[in-house]
Amino acid sequence: VRKFVHFCDKTRMNISGIAESTLETFVSNGWVKNFGDLYELEQHHDEIVDTDGFGEKSYQRMQKSIDASRKCTLNQFIAGLGIPMVGRSAGRILNKHFGGDWNAFEDAIKSGFDFTVLKDFGETMNNNIHKWYADKDEEMLWRPLLTKIEFIKEENKTMSTKVTPLYGKTVVATGKLENYTRDGIQNKLIELGAVPASSVT
């Protein structure tokens, strides 16, 4: 269940309306066995709306969020897969390197690509990606998903280097900023050409 919670998180595939307890029910009832099953829950509409604490309105809100997540970026997708040590920051780097193209990312793994050539990717992360891809149990979780979603490529929002002194610099945001969430701050830093980091090294 934890893998599904991780996948649905708002900072990953951003599927709202599915609490951990709801996912536990879906899994225990056999409605969700892999990530792709989340996109076929309409097959269980009647059973779901009859579930305690889950009426038609809750179902429609959940379904709307699921449908919205059918279009996602490569970095969202990778971050949601649960590859050890490969989260949002690594997902952004992979998204940029492979141009938002899942097939390019998968082909690189198949060809034995050395991910340590990428910024901030060490040997452990490189090994984790290759081990994850070779794990047949993991593949049974994510492979069915590929026919359910559409990858979208983010527009290059990075501003000109002439107007942003932060271009190319690693920036750690600490404290709070009015009207901005932490993710919002990171997205703004990316727009300014900076590389957001979670801690000072």
Residue ranges and their predicted role:
Residues 21-22, 97:
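Short C-terminal domain-edge/linker segments immediately following a structured domain
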Residues 16, 34-35, 86, 197:
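A local structural micro-motif
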Residues 6, 33, 38-40, 75-78:
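Bulky hydrophobic/aromatic packing residues
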Residues 7, 50-201:
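DNA strand-break repair and replication-stress modules
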Residues 20-21, 29-55:
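Compact, charge-rich alpha-helical regulatory domains located at protein termini
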Residues 8-10, 33, 43, 195:
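Residue-level signal for pocket-adjacent positions within structured domains
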Residues 1-15:
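Cys/His-rich short segments
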